[in-house]
Amino acid sequence: ALALGPLMYEFGWEINDLDLLGAGTICGHLLECGAQVTGSYFADPGFKDVPDLANVGFPIVEFSKDGTFIITKPVNTGGLVSKATVTEQLLYETHDPSNYLVPDVTADMTNLELEDDGANRVIVRGGKGKKPPEKLKATICCDNGFMGEAEMSYAGPNALARAKLAGEVISKRIETLGLQGQLRVEIIGAGSVHFSHDEESSYNLPENGDYRVRTSGIYPLKHQAQQLVDEVMSLYCCGPSAGGGGRGYVTPQSSTASILVDRKTVDPNIRVKIF
């Protein structure tokens, strides 16, 4: 919307100019994550190198009235604009490229053409649009208890075994306390992104190293989450040898759910204040 609105105003597009609205929406999709289209998140050293990422430039769009536009970035900035960076961002969070749903139009990316226009300049043309969806997306938020989260590090000889033991101790103590919640125990350095609370996750990892046990749990009541944190902190004196760097905290949690509502039930109300 932050791209499509100004384009409609500047070029005098009407709400039934569906192909133009589709092109403007695709432009907004490319811009919505900022520097991702100029090389951030794209970068993968040795495979997809991006120069001077620390000084990455944010994207600039040069838009024509016919729906064609150019993606570029400021001069003397790092990053990269190429057909590859644009393609990755086009597909980012896109479930169906032929039906990209926003309230004003259903954008169609399947006929897009990308063309290099010199260094760090890519032409995008061929955006299409179809009638807008009959239903709108709404996000519902509600309270969902409290998360207790705490960590403890183990380093040096036999560190992995000590970290595993710490995780087992915490799991058993939480069970003894009778805390009913969503408990997760993982070992950072041994597979925290891929859940590490099993033997297979640490296969072929060095026993001597630097590992950090992270424990988290979501509970209905704040004091229950605090109990989890306290148990992890107790590992200093009541856990495996030489734990250190402990920290923990409790935070309130919210859950979200997405639903579809009939657009006829939504009455837009816009208020603009000029300061």
Across the structure, where does each feature detected by a protein language model lie?
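Structural signal for hydrophobic packing residues in well-ordered secondary-structure cores
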Residues: F11-G12, L30-T38, K65-T68, T87-V102, ...
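C-terminal non-catalytic interaction/assembly regions of soluble proteins
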Residues: R125-F275
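A conserved active-site cap/scaffold subdomain adjacent to cofactor or substrate pockets
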Residues: L20-K131, M147
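A glycine- and small-aliphatic-rich helix-loop capping segment at beta-alpha/alpha-beta transitions
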Residues: P6-L18
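Compositionally biased, low-complexity repeat tracts
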Residues: L18-L20, F63, L205, L235
